From Swiss-Prot:
A Pfam family per the record: RNase_HII
PANTHER family linked: RIBONUCLEASE H2 SUBUNIT A, RIBONUCLEASE HII
Lineage of source species: Bacteria, Pseudomonadati, Pseudomonadota, Betaproteobacteria, Burkholderiales
Function, in words: Endonuclease that specifically degrades the RNA of RNA-DNA hybrids.
Cysteine pairings via disulfide bonds: none
Signal peptide extent: none
Family: Belongs to the RNase HII family.
Entry protein name: Ribonuclease HII
A cellular component term, taken from the record's GO annotations: cytoplasm
Keyword field: Cytoplasm, Endonuclease, Hydrolase, Manganese, Metal-binding, Nuclease
Chief localization: cytoplasm
UniProt cofactor(s): Mn(2+); Mg(2+)
Entry EC number(s): 3.1.26.4
Annotated residues for binding of a divalent metal cation: D21, E22, D113
Length: 202
């Protein structure tokens, strides 16, 4: 793939290139997650793609393969409280920063999905739709998505009345109906408009 070659490890052979992506900016509940991945060019992983187009079982299998074969990977998050105190964009960038800083080696370059980048101690380049173009970003999107989905399963066990296992925190009709019935739980983002509608401030 031309885009993968353009942004690949060959240009930075000493320390590698990290792909960075997030999961969970839009939902009404739960932390926002981010991951950073430095792939091993000697151990390519087939099937990497934007996590949103992969079925859950495929994502899980790829996540395990990424963890086993990548040169370095890290998953991080910013909590619901952090989202409410600093806003979702800043919290997302904080989670990305934590993910890159958690790698066991500092990359020469971080390729970040989207058009906003965190402050890092290495060179940074943003790439629109990078999760579909650059394998390292695809890998990061898969790790972030599977980690957040696991977190929402945990929240479902704590607060089964909301159906987090079904909508993953997004503002679906079911979720909004359960919010009207039960009100927000401690993991709902009080700075988000649908939660503010219940008269609970951040």
């Amino acid at each position: 793939m031309a885009q993968a070659d353009l942004f690949g490890d060959a240009a930075y052979p000493d320390q590698g290139v990290a792909g960075v992506d997030e999961a969970g900016r839009g939902p009404l509940a739960g932390a926002v997650y981010a991951a950073a991945v430095i792939l091993d060019p000697q151990r390519p992983i087939d099937g990497l793609a934007d996590s949103k187009v992969l079925k859950a079982e495929r994502r899980e299998r790829l996540a395990e393969q990424i963890k086993a074969q990548a040169l370095s990977w890290c998953i991080a998050c910013a909590s619901t409280d952090e989202i409410d105190s600093m806003n979702i964009l800043r919290a997302t960038l904080l989670a990305m920063q934590r993910a890159v800083e958690g790698l066991n080696q500092l990359p020469s370059l971080a390729l970040v999905d989207g058009n906003q980048a965190p402050r890092l101690r290495c060179a940074v380049q943003t790439i629109i739709k990078g999760d579909a173009l650059v394998p390292a970003i695809s890998a990061a999107s898969i790790l972030a998505k599977t980690a957040r989905d696991a977190e929402l399963q945990r929240l479902h066990a704590l607060y089964p009345q909301y159906g987090f296992d079904q909508h993953k925190g997004y503002g679906t009709a079911l979720h909004l109906a359960r919010l009207r019935e039960y009100g927000p739980c401690p993991e709902h983002r009080r700075s988000f408009a649908p939660i503010k509608a219940f008269g609970i401030s951040a």
